[in-house]
């Protein structure tokens, strides 16, 4: 069984800053693996297939579901999103910290697969700030943004199921917090075999 203490799940509303914080972690911690989501939505401006997402057709995605290729999948804003199994298991076997950027539905399912995973909810201070960010991003219509805000409020109702909360007001401060969380993953007490440690300690002291 691989060490699921090396899993870090980032969730929260679109526009809260998950992608920015994920990129920062990859820059600061060399031995990381970003779990690339597979989606049926169209690429936004500047997005590259295989770098930001694996973009596939709905037919291809459904075939993946039938073959059991996804750890989790969900329909969000009328598009399919999913997490592939093989790359995650390979990264864990190699001792890497695996980072997920997924929605709240995906978080719930992943925690069933990996109960020791650490989860962080990232949000703005309020919905007005989130709305401003989405408008500035310029990739969604006003109607889509309103749907995102409604969905964001629903996601906020799930806060209690997460280990940490980051209110992303000050980006530099948020970077410090997420880096601190990531660095402590492998040092959590639950990750250790207490019996083995105690025996080793006793033998060394004799």
Swiss-Prot record:
Going by the UniProt record, its keywords in alphabetical order are: ATP-binding, Cytoplasm, Kinase, Nucleotide-binding, Transferase
| Residue intervals of the Guanylate kinase-like domain | 5-183
Enzyme kind, highest EC tier:
transferase
Check the record and name the SUPFAM superfamilies matching this protein.
P-loop containing nucleoside triphosphate hydrolases (SSF52540)
Q: Main localisation, per the record? A: cytoplasm
The answer, when asked if Transferase is one of the entry's keywords, is: yes
GO cellular component terms, alphabetically, are: cytosol
Q: Which superkingdom, per the lineage? A: Bacteria
Query: What compartments host this protein?
Result: Cytoplasm
Ligand binding (ATP):
12-19
Catalyzed chemical reaction(s): GMP + ATP = GDP + ADP
UniProt-listed InterPro entries? GK/Ca_channel_bsu, Guanylate_kin-like_dom, Guanylate_kinase, Guanylate_kinase_CS, P-loop_NTPase
Q: Function, please?
A: Essential for recycling GMP and indirectly, cGMP.
Family note: Belongs to the guanylate kinase family.
Q: Which PANTHER family match?
A: GUANYLATE KINASE, GUANYLATE KINASE-RELATED
- Descriptive protein name: Guanylate kinase
Q: Which organism is it from?
A: Helicobacter pylori (strain HPAG1)
Q: Which gene encodes it?
A: gmk
């Amino acid at each position: 069984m691989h060490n699921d203490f090396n899993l870090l799940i980032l969730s929260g509303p679109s526009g809260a800053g998950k992608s920015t914080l994920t990129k920062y972690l990859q820059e600061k911690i060399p031995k990381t693996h970003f779990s690339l989501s597979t989606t049926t939505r169209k690429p936004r401006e500047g997005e590259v297939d295989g770098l930001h997402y694996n973009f596939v057709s709905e037919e291809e995605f459904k075939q993946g579901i039938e073959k059991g290729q996804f750890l989790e999948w969900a329909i969000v804003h009328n598009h399919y999103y999913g997490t592939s199994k093989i790359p995650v298991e390979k990264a864990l076997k190699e001792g890497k910290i695996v980072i997920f950027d997924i929605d709240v539905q995906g978080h719930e399912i992943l925690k069933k697969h990996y109960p020791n995973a650490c989860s962080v909810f990232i949000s703005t201070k309020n919905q007005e700030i989130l709305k401003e960010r989405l408008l500035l991003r310029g990739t969604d219509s006003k109607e889509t943004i309103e749907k995102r805000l409604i969905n964001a409020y629903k996601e906020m109702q799930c806060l209690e199921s997460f280990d940490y909360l980051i209110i992303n007001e000050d980006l530099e401060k948020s970077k410090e917090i997420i880096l601190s969380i990531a660095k402590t993953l492998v040092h959590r007490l639950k990750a250790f075999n207490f019996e083995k440690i105690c025996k080793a300690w006793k033998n060394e002291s004799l």
